[in-house]
């Protein structure tokens, strides 16, 4: 049996979240969290017995917050909010996204500030551990008041409503509960709202985008280094002293990655005394551009790790003082802005890759055969592959427009400013998909260029990068049906084959 990860509420690391995104990691809740969970639950009970009126416990929601609910309707109130808020539409979230979302929700609830019973948290853990994933539509949240619709679809399963995905099949929530050894739950006061309020969907999407960006940047450094050799680029721009005097650590780290990958290359040594003074920016300024992207990724990581471990419920239960305080921690503006930074970084990684690929097919810049193929004219080589790359890079410019500057009032103007964090995070997948295609095309081109430099060899590390490509796609000695080769190369990127190959040479996050 696979060992379970001991979840200490509020102490999730980026490494754990990365693992959960890539595969199923069973969890168990640290017993020392139980007391705080029980204390917050008792505070909610006290509110009811004392006859106090507290938002979310015995009132309506949103614009109806001033409507008091009688005691005999409190259970119905919590059930109703879950069912009415399960209004999402569109494609269902992937299993990896739902895993992250559930982990983050469990982590937040187990902090003991939501007033929810341990039995409800344990039910979520049971679903998660049995890989019974709620069927959650991707669209329907504006990132304030939390991710209501997505989390309602998750929570409805606990009531025996909605559907789940189990072993790739979509089945009823009732069957899913049986698989996890559960019965439908009747929610106690505040529990429905506690399940729904929170930024976990937005944060899961943004974290997923961070992992995509990490993969893209690692792959881009490896492919960019291969392009340097294919184009007979200079090593001087990667000299450590250049980057140290500027002082940006991320730029220094990216330059270190390039030096590591390019060291001891026969191709590099072959033109050390050439008269060419400077390379175009797409080769020469890679540490500066990719370093800037890495800076944004590191900043986004800090924000998202904090958010993943924070409490984004409302109201918040402070059992030590018997207070239940209403605020706005559900507003995901910080997540939206982090996702916007990642969108810009991802788009720039793709934009720079497209320029490097364009350089390689231009014989006047690279010294390689035009469009990287012999018998040009009869053969068009990589001519239209570069057009595809340009189309993808241009599309990403629209995707990278900041989502956080948009807002649209909801709930009859009670919720009059929202973050759009869910879309901000979700569109990162589409940007990455385009970037992976751009990088795949450059990798094909750079590998072709390396072959044209034979018998000179690139570095040992980059020979491995070249060999990985050639294990799937052969040399272009003449024109052939091109699209399948791009898809093969793209899979090597999206499935982490390339980033896993070079990750020990390139330390990023």
From Swiss-Prot:
Post-translational modification, as annotated: Contains an active site 4-methylidene-imidazol-5-one (MIO), which is formed autocatalytically by cyclization and dehydration of residues Ala-Ser-Gly.
Recorded family membership: Belongs to the PAL/histidase family.
Keyword field: Cytoplasm, Histidine metabolism, Lyase
Chain positions with 2,3-didehydroalanine (Ser) modification: 145
UniProt subcellular location: Cytoplasm
EC numbers: 4.3.1.3
Keyword presence, rRNA-binding: no
Record's keyword annotation contains Cytoplasm: yes
Biological processes per GO annotation: L-histidine catabolic process to glutamate and formamide; L-histidine catabolic process to glutamate and formate
A cellular-component GO term for this protein: cytoplasm
Matching InterPro entries: Aromatic_Lyase (IPR001106), Fumarase/histidase_N (IPR024083), HutH (IPR005921), L-Aspartase-like (IPR008948), Phe/His_NH3-lyase_AS (IPR022313)
PROSITE patterns: PAL_HISTIDASE
Pathway it works in: Amino-acid degradation; L-histidine degradation into L-glutamate; N-formimidoyl-L-glutamate from L-histidine: step 1/3
SUPFAM superfamilies: L-aspartase-like
Gene Ontology terms, MF aspect: histidine ammonia-lyase activity
Recorded catalytic activity of this chain's protein: L-histidine = trans-urocanate + NH4(+)
Cross-link 5-imidazolinone (Ala-Gly): residue positions: 144-146
Protein name, as recorded: Histidine ammonia-lyase
